[in-house]
Amino acid sequence: MRGETPTLQDYVLDLQPEATDLHCYEQLPDSSDEEDVIDSPAGQAEPDTSNYNIVTFCCQCKSTLRLCVQSTQVDIRILQELLMGSFGIVCPNCSTRL
């Protein structure tokens, strides 16, 4: 815009629409062998597991029980919630009397 007052010609643009190609020409490599490896259980990433020492009591005689388990952190928290609830572990002596 030049001048003190705007004119309509200052706002009207003389543009023509352009056609845009929206097709994707990307080609993926043929990896049918790799997909089989990834989809198989052996190809999946193993969750991080650790060894845990658990000390709890027999739900029958209240004797001390020591367990060593290998688990993920998420699963060990689930076990902790079970042990704090109604879930109980029985010692070998009490298991023969059941």
UniProtKB/Swiss-Prot annotation:
Domain writeup: The E7 terminal domain is an intrinsically disordered domain, whose flexibility and conformational transitions confer target adaptability to the oncoprotein. It allows adaptation to a variety of protein targets and exposes the PEST degradation sequence that regulates its turnover in the cell.
Any one Gene Ontology BP term: symbiont-mediated perturbation of host cell cycle G1/S transition checkpoint
Name of the gene encoding the protein in the UniProt record: E7
Family membership: Belongs to the papillomaviridae E7 protein family.
Chain intervals annotated as zinc finger (unnamed): 58-94
A GO CC term assigned to this protein in UniProt: host cell cytoplasm
Localization (cell): Host cytoplasm; Host nucleus
Post-translational modification: Highly phosphorylated.
Organism listed in the record: Human papillomavirus 31
This protein's name: Protein E7
Region (E7 terminal domain): 1-40
A GO molecular function held by the record: DNA binding
Key word Chaperone present: no
Function: E7 protein has both transforming and trans-activating activities. Disrupts the function of host retinoblastoma protein RB1/pRb, which is a key regulator of the cell cycle. Induces the disassembly of the E2F1 transcription factors from RB1, with subsequent transcriptional activation of E2F1-regulated S-phase genes. Inactivation of the ability of RB1 to arrest the cell cycle is critical for cellular transformation, uncontrolled cellular growth and proliferation induced by viral infection.
